[in-house]
Amino acid sequence: QTTYPGPAHLSYGQEASCVGEAYLLNKDDITFGSHRSHSEILSKGLSCINKLSDEELMQTMESFLGGKTLAAVKKFADTSDVKELAIRFLLYGTVAEIFARANGFHHGMGGSMHAFFLPFGIYPNNAIVGGSAPIATGAALYQKNNDKKGVVVCNIGDASLGCGPVYEAMNFSAMDQFKTLWEEGRKGGLPIIFNVFDNFYGMGGQTMGETMAYNMPARLGAGITPSQMHAERVEGWNPL
C-alpha cells in the first residue's frame, strides 16, 4: 500500500481533449503541459507508441536511463509485443514519477507537476499558472532558428488567460518582424499552437461571468493578429 507524497492536479473530464490533440502529433512535435497534465502526457505518449516502429521503441526504452526503467517494467509486465511493452513502460514511468519513485522517468524528482519524457516530445508542466506559455514560445523560437521539424504545443488552462506573460508569449510568437525582416525560408510566425483547456474554473473562481471578461477564450486571438491567430473553438468532449 502506497500513499501519494504531494499535491496532484488531476484532469478528470478533460481526457478527450488531450486525445484529440495528441492524435495528429508525432515524436518531433513538442508539448508543454498545462496545470493538469497527466492525461496530456499519456495521450502524447500513446500516440507516439502507435506511430513508431518496434525498433525505434525498443531503442528508446533500452537507452533511457541505461535501461533501468525498462528492467523494472519487465519484472512484472514482460511481453513479446513491443507496443504493449512500450505502453506499460509509459504508464509505469509516469506513475512512478508522480509517486516520487526512483524508477520514475526522472528518478521521482519531477513529481506530479513536472513529469515528462523527452524521447516522445513530452516536456514538463509548470507549477506557475500559465508558466508554460513563455517557455513553449522560447522552444518554438529555437525550433525555427535551427530548422527543426515539428510544432510546439503550449497547453494552458482558461485561468492562465489572466496572466500577463501568456499575452506576451502570444504577441512574441506572432511579431511582424518574423514576416517582414527575417530571411526567405524562415519567414512567418513561430511554429506554435496555444491550446487552452477551458474547464470554466481557475482555483475557486469561474472564469466566465466572474473573474474574466472574454466569455470565450477563442476571441482573444483577434487582439493579437488580423488572422485572429487562426483561433478555433473546439468541443472538448468531441475533439475529432
Model feature map: region roles:
Residues 198-200:
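Short beta-alpha junction loops
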Residues 195:
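Cell-envelope and extracellular/periplasmic
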